[in-house]
């Protein structure tokens, strides 16, 4: 199992989650976050914003689904500009359903 975390522009969140749902990936968590990447914030006129509003999507997926999920997220969130976001993938050692105690996704 893998944990896929994507940091996205908030305006693309619905497009990404709809694309994932259309492909059968319904289970996810969305969190509104603030952060900055390589661009170190943004300057608009005389005002510099150190951190920008983003959305983080977290999904636990089977190993064989990772490439497809990344392709969907990347395709739906892409503008070609700095600030499009970042995707992180980590290994999950185990997952348990709290209500049943069942192990796995």
UniProtKB/Swiss-Prot annotation:
GO molecular function: ATP binding; enzyme regulator activity
UniProt-listed Gene3D superfamilies: 3.30.70.120
A GO biological process held by the record: regulation of nitrogen utilization
Keywords associated with the record: Nitrogen fixation, Transcription, Transcription regulation
A Gene Ontology cellular-component term: cytosol
Job description of the protein: Could be involved in the regulation of nitrogen fixation.
Family stated for the protein in its record: Belongs to the P(II) protein family.
UniProt-recorded name of the protein: Nitrogen fixation nifHD2 region GlnB-like protein 1
